[in-house]
């Protein structure tokens, strides 16, 4: 039996490998480079540039560690940062290509559209061909949302991909949208010397996350020189004058900038698939699926950004594997109750489960445990003692229902929180944990103990 997969991003290639491992004949169709947006235009290249900015931060504070540098010794070579970024991306793309070869997955470069429930029209480098498949998995990914009055032009009005490959570091940048993508780019370019302005419609940055965490992050971002305007909206742009015109309340403001980066979210990429030819239900929000990742047509599956919902690469990996396993005859269902959410800013932010507001709306008087990085030995050693770990536990049994962190390397700590929550552990079980010392993970341990009033160093 043949499984055809449309899209070679995290959901698509993970599904391809998983299905092949389970003995399936797999055909993968993708028009671009394997790895999708995440590997080529998103997660990996942005984090590569952000890591360069992190190194710059450390060098700037070298004197506080007893290391003195000659005056004027620090400089930023944007082209070398770009080269390093591309080296990382290329190595990982080659890794995905190796996985395809190792697992004997047929990869066709091109686009695919449905002719019927099982027939696909593939248009690629070798022209057009029609292929039949017993099952089809749609993993077509997503694309940036445009503002109707300010469409992307790749020259002044940028999407996130455009911002990755600028020829030089901008002296000024307006970012429309204070979510994950907007805040990561704001932190990157501000630390590289750009004057950055964020315009966000909500009353705070990263509005989907815990209010305490968002407040601490905004304070740090403003300390780094970023101009933040919440409860504000971009109204129009003057491309000739390179000016963004925006409103806050009834007042109108103008901000001149080298570029405008629009980061107001992403939408499922479904155009051109001809889903109606296969009878697959869909909407602008994505393709509805059940717990097995099946669409309304049982032998057609969908996962990743194409279904809307959680637009995260690690969720897409998981969804792809579940879809492949179910298509291969295993009775498996998705569980996305505890998906980590990471923001690679400075300091980093990592969350899982509910925010405090969400927890209180369900459980009422929840137990809150907190521990500050300023009381953690490893954080002080690293001279990165800003931030805290915050834990929400439901009141009856003490089960952990949410964890929010802001601080050094918290994206590496959130996996421990995920294990705790997936194991349905309660806060009092923390008494039996032993966290290595000195490590940042002690903050999570102490925050757990704090929910039952037993934190030692608080």
Swiss-Prot record:
FAD binds at residues 30-38, 47, 112, 305, 313. InterPro entries: Class-I_Pyr_Nuc-Dis_Oxidored, FAD/NAD-bd_sf, FAD/NAD-binding_dom, FAD/NAD-linked_Rdtase_dimer_sf, Lipoamide_DH, Pyr_nuc-diS_OxRdtase, Pyr_nucl-diS_OxRdtase_dimer, Pyr_OxRdtase_I_AS. NAD(+) binds at residues 177-181, 200, 263-266. GO terms for biological process: 2-oxoglutarate metabolic process; acetoin catabolic process; pyruvate metabolic process. It comes from the Bacteria. Belongs to the class-I pyridine nucleotide-disulfide oxidoreductase family. This is Dihydrolipoyl dehydrogenase.
């Amino acid at each position: 039996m043949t499984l055809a997969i449309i899209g070679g991003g995290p959901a698509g290639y993970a599904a391809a490998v998983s299905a092949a491992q389970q003995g399936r004949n797999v055909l993968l169709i993708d028009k671009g480079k394997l790895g999708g947006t995440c590997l080529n235009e998103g997660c990996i290249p942005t984090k590569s540039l952000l890591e360069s900015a992190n190194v710059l931060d450390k060098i700037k504070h070298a004197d506080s560690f007893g290391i003195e540098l000659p005056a004027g010794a620090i400089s930023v070579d944007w082209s070398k940062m770009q080269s390093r970024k591309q080296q990382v991306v290329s190595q990982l793309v080659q890794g995905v290509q190796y996985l395809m070869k190792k697992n004997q997955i047929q990869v066709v470069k091109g686009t695919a559209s449905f002719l019927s429930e099982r027939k696909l029209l593939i248009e690629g480098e070798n022209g057009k061909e029609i292929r039949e498949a017993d099952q089809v998995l749609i993993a077509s990914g997503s694309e940036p949302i445009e503002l109707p009055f300010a469409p992307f032009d790749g020259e002044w009005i940028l999407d996130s991909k455009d911002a990755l490959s600028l020829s030089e570091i901008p002296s000024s940048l307006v970012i429309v949208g204070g979510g994950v993508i907007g805040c990561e780019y704001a932190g990157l370019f501000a630390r590289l010397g750009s004057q950055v302005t964020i315009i966000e419609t909500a009353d705070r940055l990263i509005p989907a996350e815990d209010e305490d965490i968002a407040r601490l992050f905004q304070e740090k971002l403003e300390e780094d020189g970023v101009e933040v305007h919440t409860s504000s909206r971009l109204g129009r742009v003057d491309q000739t004058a390179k000016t963004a015109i925006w409103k806050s309340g009834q007042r109108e403001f103008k901000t001149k900038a080298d570029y405008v980066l629009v980061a107001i979210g992403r939408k499922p990429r479904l155009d051109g698939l001809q889903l109606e030819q296969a009878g697959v239900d869909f909407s602008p929000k994505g393709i509805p699926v059940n717990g097995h990742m099946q669409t309304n047509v049982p032998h057609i599956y969908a996962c990743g950004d194409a279904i809307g919902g959680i637009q995260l690469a690690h969720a897409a990996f998981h969804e792809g594997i579940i879809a492949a396993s179910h298509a291969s005859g295993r009775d498996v269902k998705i569980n996305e109750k505890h998906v980590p959410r990471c923001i690679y800013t400075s300091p980093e932010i990592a969350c899982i489960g509910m925010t405090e507001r969400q927890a209180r709306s369900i459980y009422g008087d929840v137990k809150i445990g907190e521990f500050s990085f300023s009381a953690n030995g490893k954080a002080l050693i690293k001279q990165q003692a800003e931030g805290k770990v915050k834990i929400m536990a439901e009141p009856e049994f003490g089960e952990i229902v949410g964890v929010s962190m802001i601080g050094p390397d918290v994206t590496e700590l959130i996996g421990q929180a995920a294990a705790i929550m997936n194991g349905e552990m309660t806060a009092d079980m923390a008494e039996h944990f032993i966290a290595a010392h000195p490590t940042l993970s002690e903050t999570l341990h102490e925050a757990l103990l704090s929910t039952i009033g037993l934190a030692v160093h608080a």
